């Protein structure tokens, strides 16, 4: 791993611009702090974008898809062929994220990193690393070479996004079994017990959750030597799409593009990214707090302040996309409101 590009520092925050944005917020015609998180969001974006007038109009949504060998252990409520079927749905416009992308005027980048059955689908970028990952209860989910290729795939999507002037990047995922993989990665990175982070995923009942937990515990025992190591945990227990998301978040920070993180699986990728390169944390916004029980713990670990709490558990980047209108409105409020002086409104006495 001589070319460890992910260790390159993130772009620096423009502190003077952030301070100028904070000063502007204090002059707008409202009680100081009354717009709460929206104010903080606008100030944060000003510092990250280095702009007096922050914006989130140019939106890129990348959906990374891959299958998981651990599905053979019965950890998902859905059959594996759904992953490939959903690729059709994404590009045909019928998926939730497809609808949201249209409504938000976003560029949708759908990437097949390794579904079980190869497909020649127009509108899908085929960067196949393998026919799904290996079953991580028998050995590593990925080889090092496959893991590095998946990281690079995420980075490549960000570079494509940067080339068209993207202001906000969303990563989404599709892969039956990927909540099991994400839970296993997070448990390994955080060195915590599986029941803390294992949940129903796409709809397991209580018995299914118990079984899924036991499968993950077997995998954690097998790969115990890598506990606490973010990269090895990712490669041994993760999926192609989780690794691609990790690479995307790292690249966003390095290229100066703000990323909006989606739900549980994306937050696990964000956790790995931050553990690999702590400087990338400033460039991550968090769209929502999802229904998966472990998501709350991850958000607390990442000291994240999600914008929405709607009980979502879909994935695909959908929760992050739903938060985009709030980001855009935060920018519009910051940019468009009058100051007390401009509106000839009396400010609160000092």
UniProtKB/Swiss-Prot annotation:
It comes from Pseudomonas syringae pv. tomato (strain ATCC BAA-871 / DC3000). GO terms for molecular function: nicotinate-nucleotide-dimethylbenzimidazole phosphoribosyltransferase activity. SUPFAM superfamilies: Nicotinate mononucleotide:5,6-dimethylbenzimidazole phosphoribosyltransferase (CobT). The active site is at residue 316. This is Nicotinate-nucleotide--dimethylbenzimidazole phosphoribosyltransferase. HAMAP family: CobT. The keyword Chloroplast does not apply. The lineage of its organism: Bacteria, Pseudomonadati, Pseudomonadota, Gammaproteobacteria, Pseudomonadales. Pathway: Nucleoside biosynthesis; alpha-ribazole biosynthesis; alpha-ribazole from 5,6-dimethylbenzimidazole: step 1/2. One of its GO terms (biological process) is cobalamin biosynthetic process. Catalyzes the synthesis of alpha-ribazole-5'-phosphate from nicotinate mononucleotide (NAMN) and 5,6-dimethylbenzimidazole (DMB).
């Amino acid at each position: 791993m001589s070319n460890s590009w992910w260790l390159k520092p993130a772009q620096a925050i423009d502190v003077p611009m952030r301070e100028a944005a904070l000063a502007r917020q204090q002059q707008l015609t409202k009680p100081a702090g009354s717009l709460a998180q929206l104010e903080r969001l606008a100030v944060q974006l000003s510092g990250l974008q280095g702009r007096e007038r922050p914006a989130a109009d140019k939106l890129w949504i990348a959906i990374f898809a891959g299958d998981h060998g651990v599905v053979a252990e019965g950890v998902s409520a859905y059959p594996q062929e759904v992953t490939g079927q959903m690729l059709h749905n994404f590009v045909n416009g019928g998926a939730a994220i497809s609808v949201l992308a249209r409504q938000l005027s976003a560029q949708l980048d759908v990437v097949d990193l390794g579904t079980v059955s190869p497909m020649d689908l127009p509108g899908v970028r085929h960067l196949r690393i393998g026919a799904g990952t290996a079953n991580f209860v028998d050995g590593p989910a990925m080889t090092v070479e496959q893991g590095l290729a998946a990281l690079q795939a995420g980075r490549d999507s960000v570079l494509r996004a940067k080339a068209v002037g993207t202001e906000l990047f969303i990563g989404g995922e599709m892969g039956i079994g990927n909540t099991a993989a994400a839970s296993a990665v997070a448990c390994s990175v955080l060195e915590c017990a599986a029941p803390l982070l294992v949940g129903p995923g796409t709809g397991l009942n209580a018995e299914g959750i118990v079984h899924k937990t036991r499968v993950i515990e077997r995998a954690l025992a097998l790969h115990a030597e890598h506990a606490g190591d973010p990269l090895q945990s990712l490669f041994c227990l993760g999926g192609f799409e989780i690794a691609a998301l990790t690479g995307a978040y790292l690249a966003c920070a390095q290229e100066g593009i703000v990323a909006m993180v989606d739900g549980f699986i994306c937050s696990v990728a964000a956790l790995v990214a931050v553990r690999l390169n702590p400087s990338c944390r400033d460039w991550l916004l968090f769209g929502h707090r999802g229904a998966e029980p472990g998501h709350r713990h991850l958000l607390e670990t990442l000291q994240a302040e999600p914008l929405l709490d709607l009980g979502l558990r879909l994935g695909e980047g959908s929760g992050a996309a739903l938060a985009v209108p709030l980001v855009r409105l935060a920018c519009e409020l910051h940019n468009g409101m009058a100051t007390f002086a401009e509106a000839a409104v009396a400010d609160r006495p000092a």
